[in-house]
Structures are given as structure tokens and as C-alpha cells.
Amino acid sequence: MSTATRVTAASVVPTAKVEPLTCAIGAEVQNVNLGAAARDPGLMAEIRSLLLEYKVLVFRDQDITRAEHVTFARHFGELEDHPVAGSDPDHPGLVRVYKSPEKPNDRYENAWHTDATWREKPPFGCVLRCVECPPVGGDTMWANMALAHDRLPEHIKRQITGLRARHSIEATFGAAMPIEKRLALKAQYPDAEHPVVRTHPETGEKILFVNGFTTHFTNFHTAANVRYGQDFAPGAAQLLQYLISQAQIPEYQVRWRQPNSVAFWDNRSTQHYAVMDYPPCHRKMERAGIIGDTPF
């Protein structure tokens, strides 16, 4: 879809304008109020189309209520409850991520990840509103994992075809918990297994689908076709870390910070990273995660 076509397609709201943020990922959608958007089926269809193309959409100057935030997100599917962060009691599915000098880093930042891949059905996408950001710092970064897959060396693509991997909440959110609480968390949210390369259910893109929640391959074989267990085959751990590190390549990324703005990303085809570089300042974000489907 060309840029000209994109702007024309937004004619359901004639003043809408779409500006790509980088060559790889992300676009700013201007002159759209998300509080009113949910009442316009044509506009919502266009937003979904733009999301599939750009993977991350940002909307400035969104003076919306929590109820409008939830209503917009719920248009794309039911909202999830986060097992660790919890939800706003008055707006189920809306998670408050408030950071201050008095609250230490609690593992929501400084790690590349795709949200909740430890679920059998990881989120379709997430809608994040910046309530308050520090004067400098506090960016959120996203990486295009379809592009990351496309640019892998061909021999790596062949090597990972058909591979599957385990994803765990215990190894991340549970890592700093007392053992009893950690085991209870894992019992409630057992590990999930997903393909290392998933197919996007709407675009057909091949996506590199490993991240900070991924612990090991479950069917890795050596060249001699000998199994050594979960992740003990020579080279398995190194290969996994190599794949996870692809999100760190700047050419695949976009970053954003703007008070009162909203970011909407396709969780199926991206990773993201909240940069913890702003203490002693405040950062207040509110997020709605949309339930997705089983990766294939």
C-alpha cells in the first residue's frame, strides 16, 4: 500500500494524516480522536489496517478517559487481566504502570520482550497511554520482528524452521519472588510452547517469535540428530540468545515518548522495551492488553 493510498484510505476522516516514523516500523496517525473513533466503524477498520502495515501506531494529544481507553481497546477483542500488575478495579483490563523515585524498578523496564508469550494465547496487541512522562528519558522502543526474521542469514532460517520453544512467567516476573509465591504463580500460569517462527494470522508474515520470556528450545537436534534434553544440545543456548538479540538492532526499531499520547502496537509481530533512564522522575503509563490467538 503506497503512502498516497494510505492517506486516501483514511478518507472516513478526511483530515486524518499518516506519517511513517522510520523506514522499518511505526507511524503517527494525526487528527484522530480515539475517544470518538470507537463509534466510527470505518475509521476503526482503517486503524486496524494501518496497524497491520506499520505494527506500531502513535496518536498525539489524546485527552481520553480511562473508560474511552478501554472502549477503544475492546473494539479489537476482549481485554486480559495481568496476573502480576493487576487491573484498575473500576476499569477491568486497564493496567496502571506508575513509577516514581520511591518505587524501585520491578522488571517492567529494561528488557526486550513480547507481552505475555507465556500464555497459550498471547495478546493480539496493546494500547498504551502516556499519562505522565519525565522531562527527558522514559522512551518506549519497539522492534519489527517480521523484518528481523526476513534479514536472518538463510542458513539460520533453515536451522530454525520447525523449531519450538518454551516461554515462562516464572523466569521473569517470578524470578524475584519468594519460592512459595513463585511456585504458585507457575502453577496458575504454566509454561507455554510456541513456534520459534510464527505466521501472522492476518498478513501471513513470518515472525521471529522468541524474546525475554523464552527459556529454551523444546525440539532442538544436533546435526547428528541426537537429543540431549530440553536445551542442552550443543549450540542451542547460543542460537536462542542470538535470535533474541535481533530485537536490539537499531534499524528494526522505533522509539517514542510524548505526554498524553497513545501507542497501539501489534504484539504478534513486535517486541518492546521501556527504557529505565529517568530516575528520579515520575513515569505514569496505562495499558490495555487485547487477548490474541494461539501462535502457529
Residue spans for each PLM region:
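Non-heme Fe(II) oxygenase catalytic core, chiefly the N-lobe of the double-stranded beta-helix
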Residues: 2-262, 267-296
